[in-house]
């Protein structure tokens, strides 16, 4: 099974924390979509005939894309790849884009999972992060989606925001749970160079929270969500049983995926490819760059990605894929963390 990823890089407003590639020039939407269709045709052999299990629209803000255009990309992909077994089609959205009319057309297009970028249910926190929506709009967006029949909704939350402690975080977690969503991704705020927060930090006007605060807030997220029946199945991801993110699992488990659009990444099992991070250059046809992974690269990625998940490393699988020597080395290198109980070894798995 394989995955398809479509990158829609446009945003109406740049969030204060975001260091992803994005563009605010929405006039380029139509030329970009035409180029994405051309890239689909050009890379029709990339997945080697593997059936597509998941499809994902990320950004940027994919909900700025007309639902008819989303349908066009999905329909085109279905003529090139075997999408008959596709189980999950996700679109990332800002709350203020999710009108009933938009949601209805999107659902008919085949989108069956929404990822709503709420980040916080506190208006002051949202304003600090330069988000477009407010808390009331976030609540209404999820409720509108539920009324339109969406039964698989995930929301993003951010914790570790300076000036907003446990009480604010607890209220946001409680608000998300009260909405009855099936999945919650909780990310710690990182202050990156080149972002609004990064520039303020460089001027001494913004300071990240300390490590003790980070640990306390992460523990609060874990305890609150697992206490509500969610599985903490990956570092930042929590799901009710049966609602884990299938597309993201492709990245953590070495599954093939094809990325379409500027700055999109792809993996065919041996090589990683990435498109130029520029709408202008992408439309102009700048070719993707590639890196062939050595066995050592693949092994290191295997260890790092598996340790992000609750299942961890299956040592028998590691031995089968990379040989006894490398599997044994994992155990040797992990010994200090096993002794401190930071890692646990049980039934042939280390997590």
Predicted regions: what they are:
Residues 9-20:
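Local cysteine-cluster metal-coordination motifs and their immediate loop/turn environment
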Residues 238, 347-350:
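Short, Lys/Arg-rich nucleic-acid/phosphate-binding segment
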Residues 11, 182, 256, 348-349:
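Beta-strand-connecting loop/turn residues
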Residues 1, 22-45, 50-324:
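C-terminal scaffold of the Radical SAM
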Residues 324-339:
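Short amphipathic alpha-helical interaction segments
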Residues 1-8:
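Immediate flanking context of iron-sulfur cluster ligation sites
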Residues 338-348:
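A short, conserved structural fragment
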Residues 321, 350-351:
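Generic amphipathic alpha-helical segments used as scaffolds and interaction surfaces in large
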């Amino acid at each position: 099974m394989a995955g398809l990823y479509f990158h829609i890089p446009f945003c109406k407003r740049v969030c204060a924390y975001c260091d992803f590639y994005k563009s605010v020039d929405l006039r380029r939407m139509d030329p970009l979509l035409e180029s994405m269709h051309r890239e689909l045709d050009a890379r029709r052999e990339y997945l080697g005939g593997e059936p597509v299990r998941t499809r994902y629209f990320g950004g940027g803000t994919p909900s700025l894309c007309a639902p008819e255009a989303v349908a066009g990309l999905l329909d085109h992909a279905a003529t090139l790849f075997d999408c008959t077994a596709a189980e999950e089609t996700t679109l990332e959205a800002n709350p203020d884009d999710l009108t009933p009319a938009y949601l209805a057309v999107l659902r008919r297009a085949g989108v069956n999972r929404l990822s709503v970028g709420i980040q916080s249910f506190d208006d002051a926190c949202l304003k600090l992060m330069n988000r477009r929506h407010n808390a009331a709009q976030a609540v209404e967006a999820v409720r509108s989606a539920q009324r339109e029949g969406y039964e698989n909704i995930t929301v993003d939350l951010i914790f570790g925001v300076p000036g907003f402690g446990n009480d604010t975080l607890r209220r946001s977690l409680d608000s998300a749970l009260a909405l009855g969503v099936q999945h919650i991704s909780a990310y710690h705020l990182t202050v990156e160079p080149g972002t609004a927060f990064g520039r303020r930090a460089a001027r001494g006007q913004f300071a990240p929270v300390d490590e003790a605060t980070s640990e306390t807030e992460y523990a609060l997220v874990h305890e609150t969500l697992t206490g509500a029946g969610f599985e903490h199945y990956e570092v930042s991801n929590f799901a009710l049983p049966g609602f884990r993110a299938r597309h993201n699992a492709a990245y953590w488990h070495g599954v093939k995926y094809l990325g379409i659009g500027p700055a999109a990444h792809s993996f065919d099992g041996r090589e990683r490819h990435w498109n130029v991070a520029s709408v202008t250059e992408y439309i102009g046809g700048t070719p993707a760059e590639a890196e062939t992974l050595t066995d050592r690269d693949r092994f290191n990625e295997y260890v790092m990605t598996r340790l992000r998940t609750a299942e961890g490393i299956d040592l028998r699988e590691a031995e089968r894929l990379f040989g006894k020597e490398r599997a044994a080395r994992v155990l040797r290198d992990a010994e200090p963390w096993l002794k401190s109980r930071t890692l646990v070894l049980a039934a042939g798995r280390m997590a």
